[in-house]
């Protein structure tokens, strides 16, 4: 039987290390943590210098254990799609099963857990990670992806509803005449029309459009891309924050198939790409995500623009 590589994905304080230990206890898998390696070579797991050296050591140990037939757990935040794909390419020469577990915890629970941790990560750092969050998908090269909901369903519901209420704010940006919640509701209606024309799922396309900007209240700043004060509001990272919250909402209590939850999160995190990439990069990106997801992303992009 092939060894199993399990990569954990999640922000600080989400419970990744606990999940890693639970898996290791059942399977005997070897855990490799970037925090542990930093503590080993620098004497401080918070030390962020020379991350390349930390990664090289971790990769070397992961490859060694997989070649020796051991199951391996890679415990780090692993929030970035490009870096995850790069890691999978680095172990492509080893015949193993590639699994990914996304650990999702409400920010409220994370804040409470931080109070009990010996090693505390500031919530400002957690917020930055939420904005950087990119949900894994099978186009990255995984054999299996699981969502590990680390908060209770009732806490997920409360956290989602709290953020939804926060969306009743003006955009304060010339691209939008509607409030954030008004824009999303309008986009949801537009998405139904575009999905009907494309002969594809109405319910899920409407749902994604209805929450695609839900991260905006937590990301609103009056600072431009260059860090200069701005009279208009900007929303850096709202797509990542929103993607994360789509998975908070899509907990087991809501009975939404996991594969659909993953695709929905990816649509939210990628809905700004056509503004952020040059034509060549955008073409490569569209090829990466594949025709089915691109079809749904196009519907979301059109609905988003039509609801401005």
Enumerate the language-model features and the residues they cover.
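Conserved phosphate-donor/acceptor-positioning beta-strand/loop module used by diverse small-molecule
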Residues: 94-113
């Amino acid at each position: 039987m092939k060894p199993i590589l399990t990569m954990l994905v999640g922000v600080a304080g989400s419970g990744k290390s606990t999940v890693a230990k639970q898996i290791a206890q059942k399977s005997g898998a070897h855990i490799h943590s970037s925090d542990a390696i930093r503590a080993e070579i620098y004497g401080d797991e918070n030390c962020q210098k020379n991350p390349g050296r930390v990664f090289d050591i971790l990769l070397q140990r992961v490859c060694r254990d997989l070649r020796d037939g051991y199951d391996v757990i890679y415990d780090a935040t692993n929030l970035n799609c490009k870096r995850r794909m790069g890691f999978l390419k680095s172990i492509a020469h080893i015949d193993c099963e590639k699994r990914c577990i996304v650990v999702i915890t409400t920010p409220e629970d994370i804040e409470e857990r931080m109070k009990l941790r010996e090693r505390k990560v500031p919530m400002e750092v957690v917020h930055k990670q939420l904005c950087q969050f990119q949900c894994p998908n099978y186009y990255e090269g995984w054999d299996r992806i699981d969502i590990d909901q680390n908060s209770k369903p009732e806490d997920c519901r409360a956290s989602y509803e709290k953020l939804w209420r926060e969306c009743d704010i003006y955009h304060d940006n010339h691209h939008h005449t509607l409030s954030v919640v008004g824009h999303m509701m309008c986009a949801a209606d537009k998405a139904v029309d575009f999905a009907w024309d494309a002969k594809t799922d109405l319910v899920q396309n409407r749902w994604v459009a209805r929450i695609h900007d839900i991260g905006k209240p937590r990301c609103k700043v009056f600072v431009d891309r260059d860090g200069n004060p701005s009279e208009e509001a900007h929303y850096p990272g709202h797509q990542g924050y929103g993607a994360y919250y789509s998975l908070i909402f899509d907990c087991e209590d809501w009975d939404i198939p996991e594969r659909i939850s993953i695709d929905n999160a990816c649509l939210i995190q990628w809905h700004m790409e056509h503004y952020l990439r040059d034509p060549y990069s955008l073409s490569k990106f569209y090829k990466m995500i594949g025709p089915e997801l691109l079809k749904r992303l196009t519907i979301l992009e059109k609905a988003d623009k039509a609801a401005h």
